Amino acid sequence: KRQFLESARCHGELYGTSLDFVKQAQDIRKDIIFEVDWQGADSIKKFFKNAISIFILPPSLKKLEERLKARGQDSEDTIKARLSEAKSEMSHIEKFDYVTINDKFNDALEDIKVIIMAENLKTKNQMIHHNQLIEKLTK
């Protein structure tokens, strides 16, 4: 039995997304947000054809490095490795549906909210969520 929607090794740790959790959220028609690398996003899109993907870019590599150092959690070598991984991730940006730049957190968050709202308002999604109302109004 498949237990994970996607899994990946990142920074020496194994991460994954429980398929049961995703199915439960889907059953109650909840939007699901995943924080995954480009390979995870690719796996999710293969499993859920209507999934959308948003790539969150740093404003610059210098700013990303500053943020990693400010956390105070990683060694210099780990920070260098994370920056290298970030560059590799960014080389796959064209596979994503949307891009936002996380210069100011609240601005990036607002971008993400707008993207989700716009996707939910697409006709195909409204036809699913408001099927009875639409049928009643169009008959």
Q: What residue spans do the PLM features occupy?
A:
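ATP-dependent small-molecule kinase phosphotransfer cores
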Residues: 1-32, 38-42
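Ras-like small GTPase catalytic G-domain
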Residues: 51, 61-63, 71-91, 106-107
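Conserved phosphate-donor/acceptor-positioning beta-strand/loop module used by diverse small-molecule
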Residues: 32-37, 46-70, 102
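Conserved catalytic network of the ASCE P-loop NTPase/AAA+ motor domain
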Residues: 24-27, 45-49, 91-93
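NTP-dependent small-molecule kinase module
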Residues: 73, 91-139
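Structural signal for short hydrophobic segments within the conserved structured cores
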Residues: 5-6, 52, 98
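Conserved AAA+ ATPase "sensor/coupling" helix adjacent to the nucleotide-binding pocket
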Residues: 1-5, 67-74, 115-118
